[in-house]
């Protein structure tokens, strides 16, 4: 059995009120087109053809070499859009899935079941349908007394009886490939919209006494087509619920799943605890036994097993096992933390590698640095890495002790086991096993305070 796919992605999406093509709006971190294409791959199409139009280069860039593309210059209806794919699929034997690129909730399992139903029933066309509590706006499935599909009627063309029908057309179909393009040559624009309706091929097949069937979705949510921001928000809500439920089934605990945002490509190992208001985005991986507390935000990062992240932001970073971060820490892109590193409150790390068991407990900036293992970085330490034009590196050896309020002016190297005195400004190399003091000597002038305006004696 050879399968093909046509994805309709040419529309502008006027009701989205956006410069972005409709299919490129995102749901849980992926464009709607990407969601649809991932589901389409479940039927293993020998060729996928995407019909593009509005801002076509942006749409093409999303799928790149995963799909062939055809251009629909004028949007003259769904039938016209499918006609554009004939140059890619003409004369081929097999079954062709036609699906809209704005249906992000459709699953690969449903599409595979649709194809199997189509093949097993030897249909020339199979419509993916759903039962709607409120069918207004959808095309209706009209059956005869024997339950056979006889036609699909659009909302604007439906009579009073047809408008009461609850079974709706989802806009997804499977056709015999050759018969599809033969039938498309017979459709017209004689309808309320003045467009080429793809649905008209059903009546053509019926007139030729060819078999047309309908496969009913079990979950109506999968049929959602996104035409405006309201529907986009609905799709986001449904997708978010799916994602959290998947992770819960796989052993992840959510204290308040309704408040958590997790994107589609995030991976979470079993026995992770996630509190409320946590955001996980991009290609993030969370290791087993990790705890993510309220307010944590992580994007494109790897968190090692058994770590604790407390109300902190982590971007494009790699953390080994047993790391503790936060509260209120910020790990910026290019940060690597080895095992059992502690990054405390109000610490920012950027573009740096920090060795195992090193601690930076509070109020510190570490940028463009290589920090060894078992280093203590005192409160208020700053690596001065930028001179207004260039960035420079700071290197700190193993077991070094950086005193509180140290200012390390890069480029700089602090050797193994070295110690910087609190309040020091260091601009030259510190050899291993050395103590460096880079501050002014304290001068005490007894009784001088009485001469100053703030002294109580001055107010008398």
Swiss-Prot record:
GO terms for molecular function: glucosamine-1-phosphate N-acetyltransferase activity; magnesium ion binding; UDP-N-acetylglucosamine diphosphorylase activity. It comes from the Bacteria. It holds the Pfam family NTP_transferase. Acetyl-CoA binds at residues 379, 385-386, 404, 422, 439. Keywords: Acyltransferase, Cell shape, Cell wall biogenesis/degradation, Cytoplasm, Magnesium, Metal-binding, Multifunctional enzyme, Nucleotidyltransferase, Peptidoglycan synthesis, Repeat, Transferase. Binds 1 Mg(2+) ion per subunit. SUPFAM superfamilies: Nucleotide-diphospho-sugar transferases, Trimeric LpxA-like enzymes. The keyword Cytoplasm applies. Residues 1-229 are annotated as: Pyrophosphorylase. The active site is at 362 (proton acceptor). InterPro entries: Bifunctional_GlmU, GlmU-like, GlmU_C_LbH, Hexapep, NTP_transferase_dom, Nucleotide-diphossugar_trans, Trimer_LpxA-like_sf. Its cofactor is Mg(2+). Residues 230-250 are annotated as: Linker. Its main location: cytoplasm. One of its GO terms (biological process) is cell wall organization. The keyword Nuclease does not apply. Homotrimer. NCBIfam families: glmU (TIGR01173), PRK14354.1 (NF010934). Catalyzes the last two sequential reactions in the de novo biosynthetic pathway for UDP-N-acetylglucosamine (UDP-GlcNAc). The C-terminal domain catalyzes the transfer of acetyl group from acetyl coenzyme A to glucosamine-1-phosphate (GlcN-1-P) to produce N-acetylglucosamine-1-phosphate (GlcNAc-1-P), which is converted into UDP-GlcNAc by the transfer of uridine 5-monophosphate (from uridine 5-triphosphate), a reaction catalyzed by the N-terminal domain. In the N-terminal section; belongs to the N-acetylglucosamine-1-phosphate uridyltransferase family. In the C-terminal section; belongs to the transferase hexapeptide repeat family. This is Bifunctional protein GlmU. It comes from Streptococcus pyogenes serotype M5 (strain Manfredo).
């Amino acid at each position: 059995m050879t399968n093909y796919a046509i994805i309709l992605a040419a529309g502008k999406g006027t009701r989205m009120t956006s410069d972005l093509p409709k299919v490129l709006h995102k749901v849980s971190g992926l464009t709607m087109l990407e969601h649809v294409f991932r589901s389409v791959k479940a039927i293993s199409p020998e060729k996928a053809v995407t019909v593009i139009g509005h801002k076509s280069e942006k749409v093409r860039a999303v799928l790149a070499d995963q799909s062939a593309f055809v251009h629909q210059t004028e949007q003259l209806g769904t039938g016209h859009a499918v006609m554009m794919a004939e140059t890619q699929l003409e004369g081929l034997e097999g079954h062709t899935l036609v699906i809209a690129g704005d249906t992000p909730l459709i699953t690969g399992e449903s599409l595979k079941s649709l194809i199997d139903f189509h093949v097993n029933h030897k249909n020339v066309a199979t419509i993916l349908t759903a039962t709607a509590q409120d069918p207004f706006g959808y095309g209706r499935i009209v059956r005869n007394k024997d339950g056979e599909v006889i036609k699909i009627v659009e909302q604007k063309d439906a009579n009073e009886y047809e408008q009461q029908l609850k079974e709706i057309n989802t806009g997804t179909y499977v056709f015999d490939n050759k018969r599809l393009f033969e039938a498309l040559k017979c459709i017209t624009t004689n309808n309320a919209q003045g467009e080429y309706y793809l649905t008209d091929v059903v009546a053509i097949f019926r007139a030729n006494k060819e078999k047309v069937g309908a496969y009913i979705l079990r979950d109506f949510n999968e049929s959602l087509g996104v035409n405006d921001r309201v529907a986009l928000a609905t799709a986001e809500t449904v997708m978010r619920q799916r994602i959290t439920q998947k992770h819960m089934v796989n052993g992840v605990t959510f204290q308040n799943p309704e408040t958590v945002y997790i994107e589609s490509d995030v991976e979470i190992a079993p026995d992770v605890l996630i509190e409320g208001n946590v955001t996980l985005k991009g290609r993030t991986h969370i290791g087993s036994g990790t705890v993510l507390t309220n307010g944590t935000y992580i994007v494109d990062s790897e968190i090692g097993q058994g770590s604790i992240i407390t109300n902190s932001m982590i971007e494009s970073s790699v953390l080994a096992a047993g790391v503790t971060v936060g509260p209120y820490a910020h790990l910026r892109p290019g940060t690597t933390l080895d095992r059992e590193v502690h990054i405390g409150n109000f610490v920012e790390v950027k573009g740096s590698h920090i060795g195992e068991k090193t601690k930076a407990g509070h109020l510190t900036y570490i940028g463009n640095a290589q920090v060894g293992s078992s280093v203590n970085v005192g409160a208020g330490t700053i690596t001065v890495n930028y001179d207004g034009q260039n960035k420079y590196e700071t290197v700190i050896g193993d077991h070094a002790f950086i005193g509180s309020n140290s200012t390390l002016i890069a480029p700089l190297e602090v050797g193994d086991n070295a110690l910087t005195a609190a309040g020091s400004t260091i601009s030259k190399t510190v050899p291993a096993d050395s103590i460096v003091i880079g501050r002014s000597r304290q001068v005490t002038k007894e009784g001088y305070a009485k001469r100053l305006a703030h002294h109580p004696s001055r107010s008398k």
